[in-house]
Amino acid sequence: MDLQSHIRSIPDFPKPGILFRDINPLLRSPEAMAEVISQFGRICDQVKPDLIVGIESRGFIFGAPLASDRRLGFVPVRKPGKLPGEVVGLDYALEYGTDRLEIQADALEHSPRVLVVDDLLATGGTAAATGQLVEQAGGCLVGFAFVIELEGFGGRRALPAGQPVEALLRYG
């Protein structure tokens, strides 16, 4: 299936000069969604995770069905104040400031093998921070899977060296 035909390019959104890659047509297509989950499943076959970690919020859209399909657990990584109970958090640098991600403190007990899933890899800052958070919380990071990679932003360079990084679609 041609997943690229399910991605809409919207010029000048959210501001002039930006070419936005809209995944909503893909989300509306049961066949395209099934193909994404199938291709992510092949990545799981390679890296053999015990858990899928999804990055807020679109990582949830792809990570939860992948986990269900592969009979794996799913763990959300969220912005501050969104998870109940004790959390482990990590502050990370943005272009203009900082942000924070959190995971429940007991989510990665027993050092599970973790695949991080999200919709988009651009600068890599959020994904890299998620990988650090997984390890800080006791998990064993085994790779990253993205629907789209915007190669011009160099996000792969921000991710840990030696970790598998897979993107189903790449744009320059």
Curated annotation (Swiss-Prot):
GO terms for molecular function: adenine binding; adenine phosphoribosyltransferase activity; AMP binding. One of its GO terms (biological process) is adenine salvage. Gene3D superfamilies: 3.40.50.2020. Pathway: Purine metabolism; AMP biosynthesis via salvage pathway; AMP from adenine: step 1/1. Signal peptide: none annotated. Pfam families: Pribosyltran. It is an enzyme of class 2 (transferase). Catalyzes a salvage reaction resulting in the formation of AMP, that is energically less costly than de novo synthesis. Homodimer. This is Adenine phosphoribosyltransferase.
